[in-house]
Design a protein with these regions (language model features):
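Single conserved hydrophobic/aromatic residue that forms the stacking wall/gate
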Residues: 1-13, 264-265
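C-terminal long alpha-helix characteristic of the crotonase
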Residues: 152-153, 171, 190-239
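Intrinsic disorder and flexible/low-complexity segments
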Residues: 228-263
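Charged, glycine-interspersed solvent-exposed loop segments at helix/strand-loop junctions
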Residues: 93, 97-203
Length: 266
């Protein structure tokens, strides 16, 4: 059974709503999204776009996760001096063997088995082959799915996304401070607009909000839109609701990579 979340409700409602000609998403604050969340949102945006609804993405900066989601929009705009940081998945670990040796600290590792990399940073000076194998086994399939979604959304091939990620710095160009020009020329984005230019673009397409104190376009936030949804969207009957939590379960509020206990009741 397909999951039913708030995003699914908004998508189904906006598709059928003739008063909503387009959906605009600002991805400037979406670095919180991990791969799983980003992939799920990207698929929902893809379905929304394929339904015929115009989806507009704009941001002054796009990371790997936020570009994955933005790539599913009908059009993707970035600030002329913004950034497009599509660099794939990965990470770095600090290996402190020499540090502990210089500090005369003895590390005793009590572990058994081949794939026991949790303590390697304390007694190795580099990544073990087994650790590399398990990390590649985890990350490569996820990155392949992300590349495929990005490429499909922009009418490109996965190898084009891989090339862009591999040569992130090389695509800056002479005297450039970012790779936006390359992205524009190669259909990774549709183009660039400053904040005033984008505001004017939206006004021309959707009209000016006469009730706003400053010049802006007609829009309604998803929170305000939710208040106007009057359809019966309840799922009655004998259903089991599953609330998913991503990250380490720790005390406190929910944050990036942390499933806060204060909002999770088991």
């Amino acid at each position: 059974r397909r999951s039913r979340g708030l995003g699914d409700v908004y998508k189904r409602q906006s598709v059928d709503d003739e008063d909503i000609p387009a959906v605009f998403i600002d991805f400037s604050s979406t670095n919180f999204a991990g791969p799983t969340t980003a992939i799920n949102i990207a698929k929902e945006l893809k379905a929304l776009r394929e339904s015929g609804k115009r989806v507009i993405a704009f941001s002054d900066r796009l990371s790997t996760s936020s570009y994955l989601m933005a790539s599913q929009a009908s059009e993707v705009w970035v600030h002329p001096v913004g950034s497009l940081s599509v660099r794939g998945l990965g990470g770095m670990r600090n290996y402190n063997k020499e540090l502990f040796e210089n500090l005369k600290i003895n590390i005793h590792n009590y572990s058994q088995g081949d794939f026991k990399s949790a303590t390697e940073t304390s007694w190795r000076s580099n990544m073990s082959e087994n650790d590399r194998i398990q990390r590649e086994a985890l990350l490569f399939p996820i990155w392949d799915e992300m590349k495929a979604l990005m490429a499909e959304g922009r009418g490109l091939e996965a190898k084009d996304i891989q090339s862009f990620a591999d040569d992130y710095v090389g695509f800056f160009g002479e005297a450039a401070i970012g790779n936006i020009a390359y992205a524009k020329e190669n259909n990774i984005i549709d183009g660039t607009k400053s904040f005033p230019e984008f505001r004017q673009y939206m006004i021309e397409n959707f009209g000016r909000d006469e009730e706003a104190k400053s010049e802006t376009y007609k829009t309604i936030s998803f929170k305000e839109y939710a208040k106007q949804i009057n359809k019966d969207l309840s799922f009655s009957g004998n259903h089991i609701a599953v609330i998913t939590a991503e990250g380490a379960i720790m005390e406190g509020e929910i944050s990036q990579g942390v499933a806060g206990l204060s909002l999770i009741h088991i």
